[in-house]
Curated annotation (Swiss-Prot):
AB hydrolase-1 domain residues: 26-268
Coiled coil segments of this chain: none
Upper classification of the organism: Bacteria, Pseudomonadati, Pseudomonadota, Gammaproteobacteria, Enterobacterales
Gene3D superfamilies: 1.10.10.800, alpha/beta hydrolase
SUPFAM superfamilies in the cross-refs: alpha/beta-Hydrolases
Recorded family membership: To E.coli YcjY.
Alphabetical keyword list: Plasmid
Protein name (database record): Uncharacterized 31.7 kDa protein in traX-finO intergenic region
Organism: Escherichia coli
Amino acid sequence: MKITDHKLSEGIALTFRVPEGNIKHPLIILCHGFCGIRNVLLPCFANAFTEAGFATITFDYRGFGESDGERGRLVPAMQTEDIISVINWAEKQECIDNQRIGLWGTSLGGGHVFSARAQDQRVKCIVSQLAFADGDVLVTGEMNESERASFLSTLNKMAEKKKNTGKEMFVGVTRVLSDNESKVFFEKVKGQYPEMDIKIPFLTVMETLQYKPAESAAKVQCPVLIVIAGQDSVNPPEQGKALYDAVASGTKELYEEADACHYDIYEGAFFERVAAVQTQWFKKHL
């Protein structure tokens, strides 16, 4: 395969993998999760898809990795714009069959793929893994009524302060993504990838709470495969099932790795099985 790096006019850094052969290839754009960068977790899937005959693109959202933008600023609507910017660039590449563009998203990116498809009919096929359906339920679902009211009041006060003063609190990623799985993962990778050791606005919690990928999924008519991990404590499998239920498409499937946790899908036997299932899905529907 041929691997090249590019920087788009919007400031988005991407890596473009193209299989051998002078033909127009179908394309899979891989969309990362919460504060993810393209060199972490994604290459194994990108390489597997490219070896199977698909061109692939991995990229950094603005504000992360090698892309431009305010460091750590995470807004789902902006990240969806980034996906569409990548589609715009990709369809102009001579080696790409621009009638066969698919999206693959993981975790938060597994929600973004529905937001992008709801806005852009050029997307012909979706794979979404380890995603959530409703950010409000994800963030506050285990709180009682008074705890939830107090939590929302605090967020609203912080948002008002930002509006009035322009100042806001920035915290480490694991202050927001505070489950044990994520703490272990981010602690492990930030030593190898210092660009993962960043501060993000605490109000990212509010962005997550207001984000409801199921609403976009209800507008999606293309083929959709949803992958969930049965032991996922970041985005519990019930969230993935709710997302599957919301998908409007008549061509949809739900695949579960019952014994996997959130970060297990990227290596070993879990990865081998999931990548094979996803590759077959793209071969059939893209």
